Amino acid sequence: MQQIGIFFGTETGTTRLVAKKIQARLGEAIAAKPLNVNRIEPAQLLAHDALILGTPSYGVGQIPGHSAGCLESNWEEFLAKMPADVSLRGKRIALFGLGAQERYAERFASSLRRLHDVLQGWGAEIVGGWPTEGYTFEQSAAVVEGRFVDLVIDQRTQGMLTDARLDAWVAQVQPLLLECLQQPQAA
């Protein structure tokens, strides 16, 4: 059986840490080793039908990358390398985003929504969604109809809640991702 691909962008290493925690919860038999998008080519991501993608928040809620002030290549540069005719139809994706609700309350985890919208525009099925309860912020582009588009982690302010949030979220998305891997693929 194909594995769930885990890919992330990071500037400080925190998104990588969370990606590794997710893989540990899923197990190596189910989930591939997390890979940084600044070290791979699009074909490596596109080879997976079930994906978990992680992003930090950066700038004023843009997709992280050089134009948002990142020193290293991130999602912005990776997405620019995707084929012009890319289609993510048939791919099921769960997302997680990092943010700092006290420091950036007016745009908390907004980069997650930007990545979500790009992937959905390419035809991906996004699974997950996450409640806003337990977070304190003024505004977030990542909130749609009263819920985050997917998991949000605030390692800076609420690091003590990360493990419990990951446990609950993995339990929610794992069966949906595995179901995608067990479906027969079109030729």
Task: Explain the meaning of each model-derived region.
Residues 12, 31, 104-105:
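A generic secondary-structure micro-motif detector
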Residues 2-25:
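N-terminal beta1-alpha1 ligand-phosphate binding loop
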Residues 17, 48-187:
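FMN-binding flavodoxin-like domain, especially the glycine-rich phosphate-binding loop
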